[in-house]
């Protein structure tokens, strides 16, 4: 199936990929072959370059979804007697908190509503009040609603108090600036199937080398031991266990295209244009964004569901899908919403086309009142 014949995925990942990326998966690789090891080495180096971490940090890839790498990072980088502070403003923050509980790491949360970003002053107060906290685990872009948390300011607070910072950058890495030279962090976690526009199945942790060196024996798991994974890769250039060879090759191809496009500035700029086109188009239809624009990431946008008795998300989803676009359900606890992603490999006509498909779907469903405010 050609790219033109496929639906456009307006989701936070998996997302629409290029023909070049998918073509990279047509070749089979031996997992211990020197050519494949060279791909892994090149990929690790390029991922480090995106955050300017060469010389100070190490990139440790890991099989599985991004959550595998989040759990591996918490389990490896936080000692078993460590204490993790999790600022919580959404579903993916809550997932980190659950990981801490499952792994038996002491946990403290700062809880916010889903339409607020993390306040660095709250982190400051929590660290000042409790010297037993050893780590802060922050979600950079909380994909539940699309909130962009102030990473740089929080990193400065954490560094000031001499604690370690672990950043879940799943939905920001490669599109929103993270610079290891100016934003101190112990680890940044991301994955293949997000803003780098690879396919899902591979996560990676970019960790400060001096931090990794102190992590032997921390992990609860053999397969998720980042320290052991890193040491083995450094010694042999190979993966400890069978890697997802096709996914690695696809991500290598995707990162090559990322570099050719112009790197972070170009990728982030494209997503920002998609975001503006989406907001303008949906406002014209009467939809209300869930978030204040000041805290909205240009990655995924949450909209209030239509306030109309004819609206049903399942039918809405299927009708938009028939018109060539895949949306995403809301992930909020108390408000009925749906989400539209701004990321993926598609042209500038993609977002206006999606807005037109949504408008056509509303007409087909007989939805006349998109929001209470619009009707008033």
Curated annotation (Swiss-Prot):
Keywords: Aminotransferase, Pyridoxal phosphate, Pyruvate, Transferase. GO terms for biological process: organic phosphonate catabolic process. One of its GO terms (molecular function) is 2-aminoethylphosphonate-pyruvate transaminase activity. Belongs to the class-V pyridoxal-phosphate-dependent aminotransferase family. PhnW subfamily. Its cofactor is pyridoxal 5'-phosphate. This is 2-aminoethylphosphonate--pyruvate transaminase 2. SUPFAM superfamilies: PLP-dependent transferases. The keyword Transferase applies. The modification N6-(pyridoxal phosphate)lysine is found at residue 194. It is an enzyme of class 2 (transferase). The keyword Calcium does not apply. It catalyses: (2-aminoethyl)phosphonate + pyruvate = phosphonoacetaldehyde + L-alanine. Involved in phosphonate degradation. PANTHER family: 2-AMINOETHYLPHOSPHONATE--PYRUVATE TRANSAMINASE. Its EC number is 2.6.1.37. Homodimer. It comes from Burkholderia lata (strain ATCC 17760 / DSM 23089 / LMG 22485 / NCIMB 9086 / R18194 / 383).
């Amino acid at each position: 199936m050609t790219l033109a014949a496929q639906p456009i995925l307006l989701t936070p990942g998996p997302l629409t990929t290029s023909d070049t990326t998918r073509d990279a998966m047509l070749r089979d690789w031996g997992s211990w072959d020197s050519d494949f090891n060279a791909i892994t080495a090149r990929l690790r180096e390029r991922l480090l370059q995106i955050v300017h971490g060469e010389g100070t940090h190490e990139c440790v890839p890991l099989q599985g979804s991004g959550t595998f790498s989040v759990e591996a990072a918490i389990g490896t980088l936080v000692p078993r007697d460590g204490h993790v502070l999790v600022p919580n403003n959404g579903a993916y923050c809550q997932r980190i908190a659950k990981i801490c509980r499952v792994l038996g790491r002491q946990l403290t949360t700062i809880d916010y509503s889903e339409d607020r970003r993390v306040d660095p002053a709250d982190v400051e107060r929590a660290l000042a009040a409790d010297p037993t906290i050893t780590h802060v685990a922050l979600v950079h872009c909380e994909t539940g609603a699309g909130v962009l948390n102030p990473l740089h300011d929080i990193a400065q607070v954490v560094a000031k108090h001499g604690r370690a910072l672990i950043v879940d950058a799943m939905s920001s890495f490669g599109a929103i600036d993270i610079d290891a030279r100016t934003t101190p962090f112990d680890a940044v976690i991301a994955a293949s199937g997000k803003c780098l526009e690879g396919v899902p199945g591979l996560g990676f942790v970019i960790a400060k080398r001096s931090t990794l060196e102190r992590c032997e024996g921390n992990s609860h798991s053999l397969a998720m031991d980042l320290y052991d994974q890193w040491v083995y890769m450094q010694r042999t250039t190979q993966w400890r266990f069978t890697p997802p060879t096709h996914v690695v090759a696809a991500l290598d191809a995707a990162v090559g295209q990322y570099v050719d496009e112009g790197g972070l500035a170009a990728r982030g700029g494209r997503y920002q244009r998609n975001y503006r086109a989406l907001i303008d188009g949906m406002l014209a239809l009467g939809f209300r964004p869930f978030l204040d624009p000041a805290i909205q990431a240009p990655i995924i946008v949450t909209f209030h569901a239509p306030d109309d008795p004819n609206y049903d998300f399942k039918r809405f989803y299927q009708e938009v899908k028939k018109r060539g676009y895949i949306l995403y359900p809301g992930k909020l606890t108390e408000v009925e919403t749906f989400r539209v992603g701004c990321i993926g490999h598609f042209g500038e006509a993609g977002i206006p086309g999606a807005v037109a498909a949504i408008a056509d779907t509303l007409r087909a469903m007989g939805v006349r009142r998109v929001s209470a405010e619009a009707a008033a």
